[in-house]
Every structure is written in structure tokens, then in C-alpha cells.
Amino acid sequence: MGLRAKFLTVLVAGILWVGCSGGSTEDAYIEQAGVIHQNALTIDGHVEIPANYATREVDPGRDNDFQVDLPKLLAGEMDSIFLVIDPGRTASDTEDIASMQAGTIRGLEAIHRLAEEMYPNEFEIAYSADDIERIVGSGKLAASIGIENGLMIGHEIVHIETYFNLGGRYMALPHEIHSEPVDIEMFPGEEFDEAGLDSLHQQIIAEMNRLGMVVDVSHLSRTAMLEAVNLSRAPVIASNSAIRKLRDHSWNLDDDQLVALRDSGGVVQVVAFGALLTEDAALRRREYNNIRGAFGMIPGQQPEELGAEPYEDYMGRMEALDERYPDATVADFVDHVDYAIRAIGIDHVGISSDFDGGGGIPGWNHAGEGLNVTIELVRRGYSEVDIEKLWGGNLLRVLREVESVALRLGES
């Protein structure tokens, strides 16, 4: 149950996305969703952090340009987040791996700095499912830790225990067995390596099971994903994936993968990443980047900085882009949630944003807008119990089951 200061009453009207229809039925949905959202223990299963996180440059306690910060989390009634460290996607030699290892440690230290030095009254690191519930019950935000890419382990399995002891509670397997596209806007027919698991990957899974660290199968090749699910002695998660039947992308999960995930006892955390939800959103993202490139814009540069005439040209192109390739919506996102529930049951589906890692859609584009997801779920007939499972209950169950497997392995 969320125990943050309750801002929903005054914020509901302000955060609803454009196009929400009026009328008594819609008002009833909004009112019902507000109550459910307040009462649920809400967990965002995947939020990425930048390399300079928890510094003067990137202060998570202040309202800033990032999609997740303390004011937005409070406004959105979020109770818990998985802060995810992405140490990099490729490593060609031992020097690269050492650099990735150092980056992972810096990320872990940054999250500890956030919770233990900068904002100890607002955040606390959660090391278990029970910790999440205890921390939320105390009125703080529970900060759990995920790791995007296990490639930095190299051939030294001992690093996994180091990351676990510092709070890492899920980790994606190394990216050399990932279905890693050249860009996120790939389309049907653009397939990538179907590499499977080797003995090192098997050792990594065994060690994660022993420790009680959740195996994250998002973005693996199809072959590697199915092998990982079968090898793991504990349930697995896909921390930021969507549904391949609705958007044919190799990062998304097909029906066989969904069933395998369910049979492991795991959860797919459906991600609000537009290019993984609709093809139009992928085309939009590609064209958007092309437009910015044509104006020589650097990351973070605002169009107002272009000057009067280029600004008008830029805005004209953006208006045309809006008409040609509409962005994915909260309804599109919940379409993927719906499909997963029909395919494998509501006990195996969760929610993640991938905020500050490319995620976010109109209506749920920062941590302050999570209520809009709950409104759409209510609109489609989901009950309070259903919504509580989707927003965090199912993920908590997986964490507990993974912890239990580790205890049993330790006793054997």
C-alpha cells in the first residue's frame, strides 16, 4: 500500500493525457482508479540510471529533466522502483570488461549514495521482497537494484556475489547471447544471432540461483531465452519486454516464450517503450532522430535553441511527423498487457517503464503519470486485486520464490 503523501486528488485532472473523454462513466473510472492506485504497492520494474547518477549534476531528489526523480515519484504514488545499471553493451577485450566492471561498481555506489547519504529519509535500499514491504510501510521509497548486462562478469563468476552483496537483485545475462539489434526501430525480417547458452552462461545461472538473484531474460536471443528458462531452478523475469504477436521485434516475446516464462513461475514485465509497442512508434522514433540530425542537434538540445527561422521549420516537420506516425499510447501499452494476460494468466504479468533508458509514452512519460495506466486497466474491467498483481504483487512473488530456492540450495 502506497504511503507517500497523497497528491492524487489534485493531480488527476492535470496528468490525464489529451483525448480522455468526459462523462460520468469516465469520471467513475478515474475515481475508482485513484483509490486503487493509492492502495496498491506500486513497483516500476525497470528504471535506468545515468553514469553520473546521485551527483550534483544528476540529483534524483530534485525535479529535473529525467523521467524519474523524487518529486515525480511522489506525485505518481510510486512506492518502489528497480534502479537499473547498464554498464555497456559490448566488450572486445579484457580492458573493456574491466571498464564495465568499474562502471557497475560506480552505479551500485551511486544508488547507495542516494539512499544512505543524500536522501536517507526518502529512500532505502531493498534487499528482499520483505524489505520492499517494510520500507514502503515505513513511508519511504524502496529502491531495488537491477543490472542490465552480465557481460562485465567476463569469466570471473565471483563478481556476481560482489554485485549481489551490494544489492543487485536481478541481472540480465551477457549481451553476446542477446538478440541485440543495430537499433531499436528494427522491423520484421531483421533477425539477429540465435546464439544459445554455453558452459559459462550455465555457471552464471547456477550462481544466481544459489545467491537468490533473479535471472532476467529480456533481449536474449530466442534460443538463449528458452534455454535459460529451462536451466534456471528458480523463476525468471523479462524485466522490459513486450509482445511479439503485436509488434514483431526480436526483443519481444512470442507465445512459446511467454508459456515457458509462465511454466517457470516467472513474470513478463511489459515495458512502455513505444518502439516495442507499435510499428508506427518505431518509424516515428527513427524519423525523429533523422530530423534532429538534419538540424545538427546534439542530445538534450531543445528546439528553442535553434533560432527563430530554424525553429519554425523544425516544428513544422514535427507536426507532419505527428500526423504520419502517431506515437504509441497508454492504450497500446495495455493492449500488450491484455495479450500477455490472455496468453499466460494474470499471475505472470507485470509493468515496467524503462524510463531514462528510452521508455515512456504519451500519458506515461514520467514517474508522475503512472495513474494513467491504472485508469486504462480499470476502463478495461480489471479488478483491484488484478491491478495490485500487475503493479507489483506478481514481481514480489517471484522475488520471494527466488529467495526460497536460494535457501533450499544452501541447505542441500
Where are these predicted regions, by residue range?
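Alpha-helix-loop-beta-strand connector modules within alpha/beta enzyme cores
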Residues: 196-208, 228-236
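Bacterial N-terminal signal peptides
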Residues: 9-19
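Active-site-adjacent beta->alpha loops and helix N-cap segments on the catalytic face
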Residues: 182-186, 197, 224-228
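Charged catalytic cores and adjacent phosphate/nucleic-acid-binding surfaces used
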Residues: 2, 234, 243-244, 368
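Bacterial N-terminal signal peptides that target proteins for export
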Residues: 1-8
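Conserved active-site aspartate in kinases
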Residues: 240
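N-terminal hydrophobic targeting/anchoring segments and the immediately downstream early-domain regions
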Residues: 20-194, 244, 248-412
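Substrate-binding cleft of carbohydrate-active enzyme catalytic domains
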Residues: 203-217, 223-227, 257-263
